[in-house]
Amino acid sequence: MALETCFRAWATLHAPQPPSSGGSRDRLLLSGAGSSQSKPRLSVASPSPLRPASRFACQCSNVVDEVVVADEKNWDSMVLGSEAPVLVEFWAPWCGPCRMIAPVIDELAKEYVGKIKCCKVNTDDSPNIATNYGIRSIPTVLMFKNGEKKESVIGAVPKTTLATIIDKYVSS
């Protein structure tokens, strides 16, 4: 199942905590996570009556861990306007090597979730994008950062080759 949201929670205490011999701490409980019938719920268990309830600040953001289709309609917003680095695969349904590299791109999207975006452009459906970037062979993978093309790789390359490129732009 694709991860659709990233949830971070942290507690900010307002009162000093009395010393405790039992080492009790607030516990964050996530229930219903394994059940397909109920939505996960977040609750706080505060075992110490001397300790006031913590105030929780939550930050949720949509994070996509799968490869998203980019086309001529959404290219500017998805790739050129992205704050995160973007890995773009140019492919076609009839291309054998494209079918070989697709699972590699899927794995990278999951491994780098929240750090990069992964997109794919069908060159048959969006020939103008391919022409603008000089795509003459497929699969071709381009790396974009701040709306600029930074690197390109042609052919069905190993995962480590693409991961090395991604690491350059994620850490910079």
Curated annotation (Swiss-Prot):
Electron transport is among the record's keywords: yes
Record keywords, A-Z: Chloroplast, Disulfide bond, Electron transport, Plastid, Redox-active center, Transit peptide, Transport
Entry GO CC: chloroplast; cytoplasm
Summary of the tissues where the protein is detected: Expressed in leaves and at lower levels in flowers.
List of catalytic residues: C95, C98
TM region(s), chain numbering: none
InterPro entries linked: Thioredoxin, Thioredoxin-like_sf, Thioredoxin_CS, Thioredoxin_domain
Region of interest (Disordered), residue spans: 17-47
Induction per the UniProt record: By de-etiolation.
Location (main, coarse): plastid
Domain Thioredoxin: 60-171
GO BP: hydrogen peroxide catabolic process; plastid organization
PANTHER family, sorted: GEO12009P1, THIOREDOXIN M5, CHLOROPLASTIC
Family that this chain belongs to: Belongs to the thioredoxin family. Plant M-type subfamily.
Annotated function: Thiol-disulfide oxidoreductase probably involved in the redox regulation of chloroplastic enzymes. Required for chloroplast biogenesis and differentiation. Functions as an electron donor for plastidial 2-Cys peroxiredoxins and participates in hydrogen peroxide scavenging system in chloroplasts. Possesses reducing activity towards insulin disulfide bonds.
Name of the protein described by the UniProt record: Thioredoxin M5, chloroplastic
Gene (name only): TRXM
